[in-house]
Amino acid sequence: MDVSDPTAVDALYEKTAAEYGRLDALFNNAGAFMASTPIGNVDWDDWRRVLGVNLDGAFLMARGAFRMMRDQRPQGGRIINNGSISAHAPRVNSVAYTTSKHAITGLTKSITLDGRAHDIACSQIDIGNAETPMTEPMKAGIPQPDGSVMREPVMDVRHVADAVRYIVNLPLDAYVQFMTVMATKMPYLGRG
């Protein structure tokens, strides 16, 4: 499914409402990236593709979940956005991905405020180097801020699932606004 397609997202929520009657949690985790590219060489189509999935898609999925959680009885639910470590510390030559993940922080904060009246809690989980196909190149080596190429450690993606499960299982009168889960030895502050 293309999360950046409003029609497809609306159809997903219509189907969810018809089949299940309610929605208690959304893990907003779709993501796209592009090859390491300095800003001066970023192609507009690549920029739009990354922002389309990472920001437009996150907005559309969150909006659909918010509407369903607001309109169901009893009201309420949880939206968990994947913000990434890049929401705090960018990688070199990653302007599209970094911009999209910084924007997720603003989206999370806005949903948090808008959701209070409807018992909708919104959290952001910032994940660093969970082992997925997207992080496969990290094991071989990726560019660092000092110009070197370094292998980066990854962690089992199950640790992310455990963190999401923890957030989802909290009662709606409590929430985690931001959580960071990352490989213990990954470069982070200063990206080196």
How would you name each of these model-derived features?
Residues 1-12, 44:
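The beta1-alpha1 cofactor-binding region of Rossmann-like NAD(H)/NADP(H)-dependent oxidoreductases
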Residues 37-39, 46-48:
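Substrate-binding pocket helix/loop in short-chain dehydrogenase/reductase
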Residues 40, 89-95, 152:
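Active-site loop immediately N-terminal to the catalytic Tyr-X3-Lys motif
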Residues 62, 100:
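Active-site helix of classical SDR
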Residues 67, 113-116:
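Alpha-helical segment proximal to the catalytic Tyr-Lys
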Residues 84:
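Residue(s) in the substrate-gating loop at a strand-loop-helix junction
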Residues 124-125, 143-189:
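C-terminal helical subdomain
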